[in-house]
Amino acid sequence: MSRRYDSRTTIFSPEGRLYQVEYAMEAIGNAGSALGVLAADGVVLVGEKKVTSKLLQTSRSAEKMYKIDSHLACAVAGIMSDANILLNTARLHAQRYALSYQEPIPVEQLVQSLCDTKQGYTQFGGLRPFGVSFLFAGWDKHHGFQLYMSDPSGNYSGWKAAAVGANSQAAQSMLKQDYRDGLTREEAVALALKVLSKTMDSTSLTAEKLELAEVFLQPGTGEVQYQVCSPEAMGKLLAKAGLSQPAPEA
């Protein structure tokens, strides 16, 4: 029965479902996991890299973490070619706002604008939904640190801790059990690594398979900082959390 309704995004099934949107969400379920944890002094994003190779120039490639503006970053799960289009759209919108109003765009306003674009691709013929979900982490003067999650339907919501990608339901359940208000950034990093280590499909957890980024306020200046963890620092974090495992022989 579903085959009569799943060829176009503009046709509802008798049950009121848009199958193409649901299929886009299935694509995200096959992507590497990404977690976001909101702390009292920042936001932590951690992602699982699916592409690992000794030949890959890690300093020039990013698979999960992307900077949108000086105060806003995101983690991605899904089809990366789709994500790149939306990332460029988000960066352009942020720069236009800054040029017009001489201040950084509020985090939720940018998230809402991007989700409006995603929703439009579920409502018009000849288009397909973007097969990508985002975790947005940022800070603004209106609401402080914020964490948002969006999906291919164009829906978004604010979270204290969230997961997207493979095994996201199991990760979300663990976050619900272990998260508490008032976490420090250091505690948020430990929580995110712990959850990811138990939900990743990979049997070994190494620094080369993870990306970690933080959004926080620089002590003293109060400026928003976006910092990506280096593989060396990631290895130390894993060792400190007791999660470090030897990498398999190449």
From Swiss-Prot:
Induction: Up-regulated in the leaf sheaths of rice plants grown from seeds that were inoculated with the nonpathogenic P.fluorescens strain KH-1. One of its GO terms (biological process) is ubiquitin-dependent protein catabolic process. SMART domains: Proteasome_A_N. It is found in: Cytoplasm; Nucleus. Keywords: Cytoplasm, Nucleus, Proteasome. Pfam families: Proteasome, Proteasome_A_N. InterPro entries: Ntn_hydrolases_N (IPR029055), Proteasome_alpha (IPR050115), Proteasome_alpha-type (IPR023332), Proteasome_asu_N (IPR000426), Proteasome_sua/b (IPR001353). It comes from the Eukaryota. GO terms for cellular component: cytoplasm; nucleus; proteasome core complex, alpha-subunit complex. Disulfide bonds: none annotated. Its main location: cytoplasm. Belongs to the peptidase T1A family. NCBIfam families: PRK03996.1. The 26S proteasome consists of a 20S proteasome core and two 19S regulatory subunits. The 20S proteasome core is composed of 28 subunits that are arranged in four stacked rings, resulting in a barrel-shaped structure. The two end rings are each formed by seven alpha subunits, and the two central rings are each formed by seven beta subunits. The catalytic chamber with the active sites is on the inside of the barrel. The proteasome is a multicatalytic proteinase complex which is characterized by its ability to cleave peptides with Arg, Phe, Tyr, Leu, and Glu adjacent to the leaving group at neutral or slightly basic pH. The proteasome has an ATP-dependent proteolytic activity. This is Proteasome subunit alpha type-4-2. It comes from Oryza sativa subsp. indica. The lineage of its organism: Eukaryota, Viridiplantae, Streptophyta, Embryophyta, Tracheophyta.
